């Protein structure tokens, strides 16, 4: 199964926090695809983040001490909280 970024979906970072993907942008210099996202775990933090798509989707070592979720990828689709987030938006 191919791992692709889905705009408008909630993702969980391997350290446990949740983020909403707002868009995918193109770096004007390198032409690299960039994921545009914001945190939803802290409603007072409205800072937009940008990370290259390759890194956003990269596999990580599930045995890393800071990988509290044990997940395979840096960011994974968070189906478990998406409905709650949409209802409480």
For every predicted segment, state its role:
Residues 1-89:
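Mixed-charge, low-complexity intrinsically disordered regions
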